[in-house]
Amino acid sequence: MIILYIILAIIAIVVGYCAGFFMHKRLIEKQTANASNSADVIVENARKQAETERREKLLEAKDESHRYRAKVEKELKERRAELQKQEDRLLQREDSLDRKDNSFEKRENSLERKEQKLALDQKHIDEQQQKASSLVEERQQELERVSNLTQEDAKNLIISETEAKLEKERALIIKEGLEDAEAEADQTARKLIAEAIQRSAADMASETTITVVSLPNDDMKGRIIGREGRNIRNFQNVTGVDLIIDDTPEAVVLSSFDPIRREIARIALDKLIQDGRIHPARIEEMVEKAKKEMDDNIRKTGEQAVFDLGIHSMNPELIKLIGQLKYRTSYGQNVLNHSIEVANLAGVLAAELGEDVTVAKRAGLLHDIGKAVQHETDTSHAQLGVELAKKYKESATVINAIAAHHDGVEAQHVISVLVAAANSISAARPGARSDTLQSYIHRLEKLEQISNNFDGVKKSYAIQAGREVRVIVKPNKINDLKAVMLTHNIRKAIEKELEYAGKVKVTVVREVRAVDYAK
């Protein structure tokens, strides 16, 4: 019985072991199958991700390739454009060199013709000398035969006659050569001047003394005048310009002989009209802004003139003075346009004669620089120009050209002569200058200068076409009683020093302002 239990137990153990073994085997197979499936999924996912990343990298590479290609194409395009510009410049330079070569070739041909003519003349002289020698021998023999002269006396007589004949022939040859040279020189000079004028021709317009300012409507006139005329009086006092308001629809007129002052007034009035707020404080503010804007315009004008002429390394103060020449006139001719024209003419003449073109243009541009400050003093513009050129370290050639362009001093360089010639050509063109406006402006400048010479005067303005001078005085130096005396003194000085028709009204303005701020 016990044995049976043992056997059953053993059988049960064996059966259990077998069952466990088979169960464990199936579990392992199942786990293996699951792991295999999971691995396949992971591999598939990895493959898909790798494919996605490969496509993304490919797209990025294509984008980078497109960007690089576009960049390269842009650089190539810019390079081609730059090369085209360089090629154009080279072509222009080549054309210039060709023209110079042609000019040199013409001169060389002219020299060859002269040399050939001289050779023929020399040959002719040699032949004449040979004939003279033969004649001397014949004369000597003849004289020895028919006269009682000694050989030495006969020799002296023949030599004297021969020398006289040769001297006459030589004088004729020299005279013909001089006439040919003078004719050719005159023709060459005319050609040079004509070419210079043709290559630098410029229109010239006479300068006026008024500026018309358009208004949006006629109601603006009343706002400009202000209550009891305070706005227009303040505007005229601050700017020194006559503001004329008449029946002209939607327009007012600014009148002043000083173009800079008139332009500042125009800019300020335009700003006031656009802003709409017109009162004394606003007027003064806009005038100050207009002065700053005018300074910028003057500087830019000077820089543009220097740039257009290809001039470099010029002092900024000189450039500013060049810009001021735009607002100065000489006998109705705009001084800046005249100076640019002289610079171009001098440059063309210098190029034809083989001189330094840049220095010639520089001297031509600066020859009237003294006129930018001449209204402040009685010194001649040539002397003022020399002082300015020395002050701003210009070369000796430029300084001499400025000093000599009106024959004030002796020209020490060829460029000085060229600048003087170019100045004469520019000034002598028909219609370039008008004396009437210049004399009128000179009279107004003299009127202001007389007033400014008195102690305590801050600034004076000639207005009403010279029929009135308005004098602004320093209130801390001139009281009310002194203002009355100053009026009489200025009147006497004007009567003594100035010639004029009619009457000149002298108005002395003394203004005291007290300003404080409430905090």
Curated annotation (Swiss-Prot):
Start and end residues of each KH domain: 209-294
Alphabetical UniProt keywords: Cell membrane, Endonuclease, Hydrolase, Membrane, Nuclease, RNA-binding, Transmembrane, Transmembrane helix
Domain HD: 335-428
The EC number(s) this enzyme carries: 3.1.-.-
Major subcellular location class: membrane
Homology family: Belongs to the RNase Y family.
The protein's name: Ribonuclease Y 1
